[in-house]
């Protein structure tokens, strides 16, 4: 069994110091960086994250030209198995739209509670990267902690398979999981959808396109893809950061700013208006059909500013 690369005391401190604050007009549950002192908003870069940023900056990562092969095979994308009980893993080929299959992995906790809904997780990676080798151990841990079945589909990736391939795969997997919920270990045909970044974007597309169904019980979105044009939201003054950490905090935000233009070319492939609600959740029209959504946001991230504006619009 692999060991944690950090002290569990850090997790305890995160929970202990959690507090509710109003940030940029939005009430948020804030979990300060362990070691953070005082009651002000987060103003230091997590020392563990800063070490990673420093390494990437020294290697020039982020300043080099875009390379799909490099992004798909990043050497630092390593995860650790933190489970302490048995979690089964089964690979299935799920037919979608009667013309292709999606390689799908099903993780089931040893003592999964059938009363718990199935969780379907859509990985991030700018719609162009992501694979089971990066996310599998995380899925095992989620299944164990939730005592539920977790489904991880390897949906088709751009630019080889641009819009709407990934969305069609996502909807196909959602329907399959709901229709086969009993075989998959749940008494509920309703599902919880979870995902990070681009994976959250797929969830939002499915929410719009499947609004007349009742399959989606809840969504949990980590640093969610909400608005395709994030540049208008950029305002560095909204980030509170100590001067000695500013270059590291800005590094992440600026890297994201520089990658926005690739979205329409590589994923949408100019097949749909980038402002259409199907691919831009900020422009959703029917708010009455949106299920409960939980956003989990990063400390220094352009997406955080977009999400805060979306929440204010929703309220």
Can you annotate each of these PLM segments?
Residues 77-92:
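A domain-start/cap signature at the N-terminus of enzymes
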Residues 1-81:
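N-terminal targeting or regulatory segments adjacent to alpha/beta-hydrolase or S9 domains
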Residues 2-22, 29-30, 36, 41, ...:
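Alpha/beta-hydrolase superfamily serine-hydrolase fold, recognizing
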């Amino acid at each position: 069994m692999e060991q944690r690369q950090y002290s569990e005391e850090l997790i305890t401190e995160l929970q202990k110091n959690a507090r509710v604050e109003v940030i940029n007009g939005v009430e948020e549950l804030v979990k300060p960086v362990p070691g953070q002192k005082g009651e002000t908003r987060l103003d230091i870069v997590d020392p563990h994250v800063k070490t990673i940023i420093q390494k990437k900056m020294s290697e020039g990562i982020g300043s080099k030209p875009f390379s799909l092969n490099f992004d798909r095979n990043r050497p630092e994308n390593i995860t650790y198995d933190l489970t302490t009980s048995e979690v089964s893993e089964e690979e299935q080929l799920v037919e979608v739209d009667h013309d292709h299959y999606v390689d799908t992995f099903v993780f089931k906790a040893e003592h999964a509670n059938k009363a718990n809904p199935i969780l379907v997780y859509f990985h991030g990676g700018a719609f162009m990267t992501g694979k089971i080798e990066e996310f599998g151990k995380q899925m095992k841990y989620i299944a164990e902690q939730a005592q539920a079945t977790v489904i991880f589909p390897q949906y088709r990736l751009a630019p080889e398979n641009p819009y709407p391939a990934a969305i069609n795969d996502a909807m196909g997997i959602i329907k399959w999981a709901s229709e086969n919920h009993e075989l998959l270990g749940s008494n509920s045909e309703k599902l919880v959808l979870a995902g990070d970044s681009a994976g959250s974007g797929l969830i939002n597309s499915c929410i719009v396109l499947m609004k007349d169904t009742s399959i989606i019980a809840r969504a949990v979105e980590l640093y969610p893809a909400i608005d395709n044009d994030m540049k208008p939201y950029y305002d560095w003054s909204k980030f509170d950061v100590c001067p000695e950490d500013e270059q590291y905090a800005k590094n992440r935000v600026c890297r994201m700013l520089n990658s926005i233009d690739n979205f329409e070319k590589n994923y949408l492939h100019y097949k749909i208006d980038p402002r259409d609600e199907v691919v831009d959740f900020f422009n959703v029209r029917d708010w009455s059909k949106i299920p409960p959504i939980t956003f989990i946001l990063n400390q220094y991230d352009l997406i955080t500013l977009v999400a805060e504006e979306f929440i204010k619009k929703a309220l």
